[in-house]
Amino acid sequence: MGEALRRSTRIAISKRMLEEEESKLAPISTPEVPKKKIKTGPKHNANQAVVQEANRSSDVNELEIGDPIPDLSLLNEDNDSISLKKITENNRVVVFFVYPRASTPGCTRQACGFRDNYQELKKYAAVFGLSADSVTSQKKFQSKQNLPYHLLSDPKREFIGLLGAKKTPLSGSIRSHFIFVDGKLKFKRVKISPEVSVNDAKKEVLEVAEKFKEE
């Protein structure tokens, strides 16, 4: 009987040791990390739509020297629709100067520079100011500064984008000027100061005028 008791004791100890070993080898359970919810709703969808629109607009090829003016129409300060193609059909030389925002200091210097040189420029070219400002802002700007030329409103920056004068895909315009001769882009000046824009545009217009005399 003593031998049987010792045998059962050894079996019980071995069984307990085996259970302890198995518990050591058992995989450690980790708490489940909750999945991050993706935000949805009108605001999220609206932001996504803006980004998608910006990406589409940034894919548009910029006009290069020699390219024809696009067939677009923009509103001027009087809310009249102006066809860009008709402008170039009626004028051999057309100057478009782009300014970031109406009635700001740098843009006022640029616009007034073209105003002060307008009498000479208009002998050879048509001059247009261009920005993403509203029609109302353009009218106030024109009236306050006595600007003798039209200001075109391009709130979606369609023409501004084609000219390569967008500051970012989402907003902003870069100060610049562009000169079309016989409907095609001849001069392209981007990221320049107000004074350089006026002076260079004047030189370029006079240069074209001299070539016309040789024809």
UniProtKB/Swiss-Prot annotation:
Keyword entries, A-Z: Antioxidant, Chromosome, Disulfide bond, Nucleus, Oxidoreductase, Peroxidase, Redox-active center, Telomere, Transcription, Transcription regulation
Residue intervals of the Thioredoxin domain: 63-211
Superkingdom of this protein's organism: Eukaryota
Principal location: nucleus
GO cellular component, one term: nucleus
Biased composition (Polar residues): 45-59
Example of a GO biological process term: cellular response to oxidative stress
Subcellular location: Nucleus; Chromosome, Telomere
Effect ascribed to mutating residue 112 to S: No TPx activity, no effect on DOT activity
Catalytic activity line of the entry: a hydroperoxide + [thioredoxin]-dithiol = an alcohol + [thioredoxin]-disulfide + H2O
Miscellaneous remark of the record: The active site is a conserved redox-active cysteine residue, the peroxidatic cysteine (C(P)), which makes the nucleophilic attack on the peroxide substrate. The peroxide oxidizes the C(P)-SH to cysteine sulfenic acid (C(P)-SOH), which then reacts with another cysteine residue, the resolving cysteine (C(R)), to form a disulfide bridge. The disulfide is subsequently reduced by an appropriate electron donor to complete the catalytic cycle. In this atypical 2-Cys peroxiredoxin, C(R) is present in the same subunit to form an intramolecular disulfide. Present with 1840 molecules/cell in log phase SD medium.
Subunit note: Monomer.
Entry similarity comment: Belongs to the peroxiredoxin family. BCP/PrxQ subfamily.
Free-text function comment from the UniProt entry: Thiol-specific peroxidase that catalyzes the reduction of hydrogen peroxide and organic hydroperoxides to water and alcohols, respectively. Plays a role in cell protection against oxidative stress by detoxifying peroxides and as sensor of hydrogen peroxide-mediated signaling events. Has a role in telomere silencing, which is the repression of chromatin structure which leads to a stop in the transcription of nearby genes. Also has a role in the regulation of telomere length. Acts as an alkyl-hydroperoxide reductase in the nucleus during post-diauxic growth.
Protein name: Peroxiredoxin DOT5
Organism per entry: Saccharomyces cerevisiae (strain ATCC 204508 / S288c)
Gene label: DOT5
